[in-house]
Amino acid sequence: MSVHVRYETPEDVSNKIYELVQACNGGRIKRGSNEVTKVALRKTAAFIVLAEDVNPPELVNHIQLICDDNSIPFGYVPSQEFLAKEAGMETGVKAASLAIMDVPKAAQEMLDEVLELI
């Protein structure tokens, strides 16, 4: 487990987060640490996803603190590469973090379930 990860995410929870990202892919998703930091500071994100395998961890460490200060829920997934794939990015691209801005009605139940699990 990396230094920036506060708790170990069970595989079933990670899979639900990946499914949520995939379900929200048609909506507004911000990708990358800079964009995620901006929306977290503006308090406009519905949910933030951080990859556990980020190196160096300083790339995303501050995002958790901003989420805590602004009461934005966040969760972890094991892989940057798989996170990018689920978010509809090109093969070979990595995403250290992403923010779900709008949750479609069809995915709201998924988000509620993820929030209960984390």
Where are these regions (language model features)?
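Ribosome large-subunit tunnel/peptidyl-transferase-proximal elements
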Residues: S2-A46
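Short, functional N-terminal and low-complexity linear motifs
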Residues: S2-Y7, A51, Y76-F82
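Conserved P-loop NTPase motor cores
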Residues: A40, A45-A46, E52-Q64
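Short basic, glycine-rich beta-strand/loop surfaces that mediate nucleic-acid
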Residues: V60-N61, L65-I118
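Structural signal for hydrophobic/aromatic residues that build the beta-strand cores
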Residues: G32, I48-L50, C67
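A generic structural signal for short
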Residues: N25, A51-E52
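Short, surface-exposed beta-edge/turn micro-motifs
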Residues: T44-F47, K94-A96
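Helical mechanochemical/support elements of P-loop NTPase systems and associated helical scaffolds
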Residues: T9, V13, G32, V36, ...
